[in-house]
């Protein structure tokens, strides 16, 4: 019996030792020399490769910001295109380091192992219809056929909204963004539903964009953000504070253009952000100039928003809830101190 107990103790020690020496996500990324980021392959403004295969978008730039913090190079990132229904499985499998793919933070997703680090875009679900349909409200869609993507909160919200308003629904479900958009554009459905940001983006892809309109109703809360696996608190914090650094930089007026000059600032908050004072990078396993690297390479949150989905982009979405907390929005970062 004593030898059996000793064997069990030895086995338990071996398992514990193996677990404790397993490389974390940060070390794995450093070893391979790049970050692997799960991305949307077809949503303009958030994640979409250009004609040269270069990914661009708000979510893409958050991935590049993480790469900049780690490698001082925003291009040391591989983008893995992922369909909506495959997001939880691929994240859990370890194929990607982080998922930043217009994904709604929900209770069921978090309890299933997707740990959301914050909200990089506050959104809500809406509807798009052809103007010739003569509908000016989602409440007039009783009996309509609606194109929707499978495996999304959008699909669930659609059913809830029609049921709550005692309307008949014909949901026409597709596996990918591209299939859903194509079906609506071809006339397969009366309406198309997704996050409002996605509607403005997808409208640009229609054969005749001016023939379509986004209805006024927003039927859900869609807090979109990055998610990581639940087993690596250091990595969770790196992804989380990358976003907070982007927000803090905008709040303090630190931009891609002036970040070098701002290192000379006497403002203590700016000096802490840029690593001139303190040693806040150490707690994350990063260099002390981690946030400086982020801003130098990708800019602050406001700059990322403007060029990808804001007034400086073809999509031209107003900041709305995504403005800073002191400008009528919800974007807010804890202090770096």
Regions found by a protein language model. Give the residues of each.
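Bacterial N-terminal signal peptides that target proteins for export
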Residues: 1-9
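Sec/Tat signal peptide C-region and signal peptidase I cleavage site
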Residues: 15, 19-23
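Extracytoplasmic small-molecule ligand-binding "clamshell" domains
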Residues: 30-99, 286, 301, 324, ...
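Sec-exported extracytoplasmic/periplasmic mature domains
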Residues: 30-31, 67-75, 92, 96, ...
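Extended ligand-binding regions for polar small-molecule ligands
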Residues: 61-64, 68-70, 132-135, 139, ...
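Acidic, polar ligand-binding/catalytic clefts
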Residues: 64, 68, 72-140, 196-219, ...
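C-terminal functional modules
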Residues: 270, 276-337
């Amino acid at each position: 019996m004593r030898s059996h107990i000793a064997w069990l103790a030895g086995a338990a020690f071996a398992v514990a030792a193996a677990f404790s020496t397993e490389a974390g996500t940060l070390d794995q990324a450093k070893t391979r020399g790049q970050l692997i980021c799960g991305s949307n392959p077809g949503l303009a403004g958030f994640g979409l490769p250009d004609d040269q295969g270069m990914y661009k978008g708000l979510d893409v730039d958050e991935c590049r910001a993480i790469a900049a913090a780690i490698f001082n190079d925003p291009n040391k990132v591989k983008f893995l295109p992922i369909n909506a229904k495959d997001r939880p499985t691929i994240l859990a499998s370890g194929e990607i380091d982080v998922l930043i793919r217009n994904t709604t933070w929900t209770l069921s997703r978090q309890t299933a192992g997707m740990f959301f680090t914050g909200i990089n875009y506050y959104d809500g679900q809406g509807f798009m219809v052809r103007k010739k349909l003569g509908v000016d409200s989602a409440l007039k869609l009783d009996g309509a056929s609606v194109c929707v993507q499978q495996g999304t909160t959008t699909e669930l919200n659609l059913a809830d909204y029609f049921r709550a308003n005692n309307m008949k629904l014909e949901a026409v479900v597709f596996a990918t963004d591209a299939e859903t958009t194509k079906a609506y554009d071809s006339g397969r459905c009366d309406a198309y539903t997704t996050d409002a940001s996605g509607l403005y983006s997808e409208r640009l892809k229609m054969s005749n964009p001016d023939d379509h309109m986004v209805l006024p109703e927003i039927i859900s809360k869609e807090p979109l953000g990055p998610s990581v696996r639940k087993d690596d608190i250091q990595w969770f914090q790196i992804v989380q504070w990358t976003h907070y650094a982007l927000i803090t930089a905008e709040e303090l007026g630190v931009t891609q253009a002036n970040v070098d000059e701002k290192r000379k600032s006497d403002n203590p908050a700016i000096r802490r952000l840029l690593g001139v004072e303190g040693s806040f990078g150490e707690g994350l396993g990063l260099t002390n100039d981690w946030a400086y690297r982020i801003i130098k390479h990708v800019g602050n949150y406001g700059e990322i928003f403007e060029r990808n989905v804001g007034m400086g982009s073809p999509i031209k979405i107003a900041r709305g809830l995504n403005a800073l907390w002191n400008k009528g929005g919800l974007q807010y970062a804890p202090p770096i101190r």
